[in-house]
Amino acid sequence: MATKSGEQFVAVEEAARLLDVTKRHVARLGDLGQIRYVGRGLVDRDSIAEYLQERDFYRSRAWSEETAWGAVALLSGLHVDWLGQVQTSRLRGRLRELAENERGAHELVGRTRNRARVMRYESYGFLAARLRKEIVPVSRRRLGLADTKQVDGYIDTERLAALEVKYGLRRSPRGDMTMRSTSFDISVVQTIASRGNGALAALDAAGSMDAREHGAGSRALATHLEMFAEGRAHD
């Protein structure tokens, strides 16, 4: 039986209705850690709300992983050598168009989502210290946000798969370890994170479910788009 709308948990049938999917798909989302099961046949309501909010970014057609990282690099004031000249020129034009759109920053979050798959894991014991050495962290200080003490960064997809097996990592939508899994050249990601102007941090924060982080990231991302359109991405 479905719970009342004000309660913290909902039955699978109600979760399927809220998500507009089948019960089997609800189970699949639970297995992927995108929503959270709290018991037999019960789903955490907040995890459903967070999932739906995240889907709002997905209304725009996503760019490929290479194009997404190309956009991040251009906004970061860095050179892009993995895209063709014509493709890079078109991407520059698209970024300028987004700069003129009041919802350009919001759309960019959706367009670049394929740069990485965000995975959250439960943290315990020694894990945080060890996994922190495996990731490419992205400083948020330019956003006026303190760098998080939690594990949050980019990691090669194959390396993450190996770590899941090695440490028995458990996925959870409310986990406090965030691993941004990408199959793109992780050394390039490292360069963008360490030598860029902060656009990557703005993009990460703009996609956050936390209201303060989302606001700071969205404002900064809009500024990065404006600076790019004005030819000041290197500033």
PLM ranges: what are they?
Residues 51, 74, 94-98, 205, ...:
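Residues that form generic nucleotide/phosphate-binding pockets
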Residues 10, 42-43, 153:
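Generic recognition of long tandem-repeat/solenoid scaffolds
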Residues 32-58:
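Short helix-start
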Residues 56-135, 140-142:
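Helix-turn-helix/homeodomain-like alpha-helical modules used for DNA recognition
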Residues 1-29:
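Polyanion-binding surface elements
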Residues 156-235:
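C-terminal regulatory/effector modules of DNA-binding transcriptional regulators
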